[in-house]
Amino acid sequence: MMKEYMRLESDSIGAMEVPKDAYYGVQALRAKENFPITGTKIHPVFIKNLAKIKRAAAITNKKAGRLKPEIANVIEAAANEVICGMFDKDFIVDGIQGGAGTSANMNMNEVIANRAIEMLAGKKGDYTIVHPNDHVNMAQSTNDVIPTAGKLTVIDLLKPLGKSLSLLTQALYDKAEEFDHIVKIGRTQLEDAVPMRLGQTFHSYATMISRDRNRLLKVATEMYTVNMGATAIGTAINTSPFYFDNIVPILRKITGYPLTQADDLFDATENLDGFVHVSSCLKICAVNLSKMCNDLRILASGPKAGFGEITLPAMQNGSSIMPGKVNPVIPEVVSQVAFHIIGHDTTITMAAEAGQMELNAFEPVIFYNLFDSITTLTHAVNTLTTNCILGITANEKRCNELLDASVGITTALCPYIGYQKAASLAKESLKTLVPVKTLVLRYNLLNKEELDSILDPYSMTEFIPHTQVKAI
């Protein structure tokens, strides 16, 4: 005997009891039981975008004369409520699921249908009033609504990432200006190289992150091309001519994005290289951030027995056994996020490669990982900017000490005394610990005025076209 707080629903597999007050139906519940995979539900931004597509479809089908106005109006109203987040708890399907996203699509169709039924004074589950497939999913397929919702979600999620990268870039440029007067020794392969300004180090980081941001802004525009109207494989089966021509313009108006219908709907339905491209751009950004964080950890190492050229903000105790130890936890967590995103990129790449024939069934795992990559990277950039970059200070005295102790300045002397003499000075300095400057003056290779001019910070660290070099 069925319990009073349950209702009976049926699909092509059979009958199943569904909680009476639930807006989801039998197909969503069956999917929940089939896919207890991650414990993480469909991304909430994806839910909102899928609801926007349902709203656009209802409007288009009503204008096409295929959906009765009274049915279309309640579907549109229910979709708006979903967009506002009123039924988030009724989206019960796991983020990773079999079926190319059919379970997510049907979860949405059932929630909208049952809410629309309520609006028409019916009881949930009475699909003779509003049907999940016949009405809510009219002229659609999982194979066009799911990838389109995925693209809209990528666009939405990339916006805050772009803003976060802008703030990080500006913070790095500010530090570049703040530290521009400080000369330090540059390093290649972790060995002393030639002098540079600490500001140049941070300026290079800012340039790199700005490039990452521009790359992501550009790849986001690729998401504007959608396959709505393709239905199952690209033939537009079960659509009306009006729907086919107008679904994208109506969705464009609802979203505010300059969406266009793909020229080749077969290609747009079966090939997911666009998502791989987005993921690769995220990976590049993550790699660059991690490289920068590696540098920051090295430059801040110490505080007494390391490089110690900069100091990172102290955020928390660094050890449960060593008193006073403070670790570079923010750069460390950003690097871990980078490893995480690189792993996601591999998953996305393999999932895109694994599609067969006219459809790729692995969009759920692509979206699960892609959305997480964007969101996690955004959070990492925010904490890096706020809790690290803005609070970095320079240790100018330490930079000068290491610069003076280094033989790297001998490179600046090569045009004036020759490579061989400069190399001999470097070797002698390393052996005797006598500074290179002292040796130059001791052997009368240059006078003090000439030496000071050559070793001027800007002479050493900037290309100055009018600099005159004597013949040697």
Each model region followed by its residue ranges:
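Conserved, well-structured ligand/cofactor-binding cores
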Residues: 1-472
